[in-house]
Amino acid sequence: GNSEVGHMTIGSGRVLYQDLVKIHLAIKNDTLKDNVIVKNTIEKSNNIHLIGLASDGGVHSHIDHIIALAKIAQNKNKKVWLHLITDGRDVAPDCAKIYIEKVINICNENIKIATIGGRYYGMDRDNRWDRVELAYNAIANATPKTKDNILDFIDNSYKNEIFDEFLIPTALDGYDGIKDGDGVIFCNFRSDRARELSSVFAKDDFKEFSVKKLKLNLASMTQYDKNVKI
């Protein structure tokens, strides 16, 4: 973190919760499901896609937020596809399976892991669009695809000395991409590394690489860019 938070809140005379804590509290108090944006996005969408950094590093995201949203969408009788971005920076470089196994524990007929890929690709912030394109293609187009289960995919990547931050964005068998009428919720609460990937889906005039023109319902845990409508 930085000192800005302290400078902004000194003298406010009350507790000002930061985004991580706010979302944690909403989950604990069972009020996240009542959030207007979350509720509307889920209710008006066919399938729900959750995209987020899958760790408990707490800098950009928290795995518990992804899990909570998946359960909320499932309770609305939605099919939920999880797009898990592996960390390797805010946590150890080779501990993704700890978090993936936590997600596997909630998976069932309605909640499935769709894609996996390292933050090097899905969370770029320096306009390296070739990286972002690989993340987008896995999420939107289910390309490339692996027959391996997700834990074997991670193990095989490790054998090739490709660790969590750099896992190649890949779709899992059974996932066929995002469709018209689906909802996409970006689960990271910190904006700087969520801005690029989310803009690919949100900008009508996106031109950095070829994208599918889809009618999607988009939402994010916080505002990433006031000039991009999510």
Where are these regions (language model features)?
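Active-site nucleophile/metal-coordination loop of metallo-enzymes that catalyze phosphate/sulfate
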Residues: 1-120, 128-130, 134, 206-230
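Short hydrophobic-aromatic micro-motifs
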Residues: 10, 186-187
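Long, well-ordered, tryptophan-enriched scaffold segments
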Residues: 91-179, 194, 202-208, 212
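Extended acidic, low-complexity intrinsically disordered regions
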Residues: 182-183
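Conserved phosphate/oxyanion-binding catalytic-loop motifs
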Residues: 190
